[in-house]
Amino acid sequence: TIAESVDAKLGQLADCENLIPLYTKNFEANKNNEEWLRRAAGKMSDKDCTKDPLFVKIVTSLHNVKPSANSAYYLGVMNDKAGNSAKAIQYYNESVNLETDNFKKSKLLIRIASKHSKAQAVAYAQKALSYNPSNSDAYRIMAHAYASSANECGSTPFEKRAVYWLAAKTARKGGLESLAARYDALAPSKVDVFESGLAGKNITFKCWIGQSITVQRL
């Protein structure tokens, strides 16, 4: 094919300096040609020409012609790097929907979760766990979301600090012992529990968390 003879002719000269003008010239005529777009994207990726705006155009066209989990993910990463967070999340979500491998779905959902905070971060992390129940990153994100909301989730200083018990419990579910210990250290002490008179009682967090924790018995 013409594409193969061009590749052969370029040979070792197929670097960004040569590829970009060549693909720029041929892009318009091939913007709906899946084979050409795939080859061009692959070659530009191999030669590390991915920072050029042409690469984004080629991958976007390829995604429009033949959407795949990989092209959607790639566009998500590129929009991320460009600071277009909302667009990146849109492509990551599309990638999740197109992906058939549950472990990859879970990893993608973690990437989306890390772009959010609080309730949205937890929702995406929980979705990630539904595809891979042993994804410790999901528990890390959830624990962090709870801990970062301590100040807004209790009506007393004791209740606010009790949120750290929930964060620690969540971290432990993911086998994150050192993180759990850090949150435990921020939670009420045994003296605090004794003085509160709440030992063995339930505390419900009436903020976005909407969960309860049982205060440890002394």
Label every PLM stretch briefly.
Residues 24, 56-60, 93, 126, ...:
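Alpha-solenoid helical repeat scaffolds
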